[in-house]
Amino acid sequence: MYPDNLFWNVNLYSICLTLGLISAIIVLDKYLTHRKVPGKVQSFYLIVGVVAIFMGIISANLAQSIYHFIETGEFKFGKDGAGMTFYGGLVGGVIVFFIGFFGFGKIVFKENEHIKYCSDLFAVAPCCITIAHGFGRIGCLFAGCCYGKKMDGFPGLWMHTPDGTGYFLPTQLYEAIFLFILFAVTSVLFYKEIDWNFVVYLVGYGLWRFFIEY
């Protein structure tokens, strides 16, 4: 849609990623405060979470670079790389998070206070993931890197792509809308203290991906 830089090396994709990260941090803070999780534990969750996010971004780039290398024989990583893949980032981020949570947590909390509020963390995590992911998908739409099949009109969107100019199914836009709806659903469940958020997220997003892909 508009992959060009707005100023310096900043484009709409990077702005959306930043908005997603900030939104996830705000949600984590506000929601855990509502559950009366101690400040020290919240800060620990935040630090480990931010580190996991950044490592997830790296692993998302790396996973896509490996896939691109297998497909084309060319390894591209970083600013001029092949892009990112969500599942590569999710797996890498989760691994780093658990290492930090159980490894570093044992050092910081002698009485395992961070584990005491683990259920609250797992309840809020899908809320943070969905809102951040939603902004990320909008960023993908602006970058023009992902789109569906060519169409004659609605529900397609007029786009300039490597496959030509015309109406293409804006899969990232519809996925962003779905993710924001899923964020609202998991938020309601969180505040009602119905801690089925991870199940709702995994099943809901899994079904959505199957629907949008096939």
Regions found by a protein language model. Name each.
Residues 1-214:
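Hydrophobic, membrane-interfacing alpha helices
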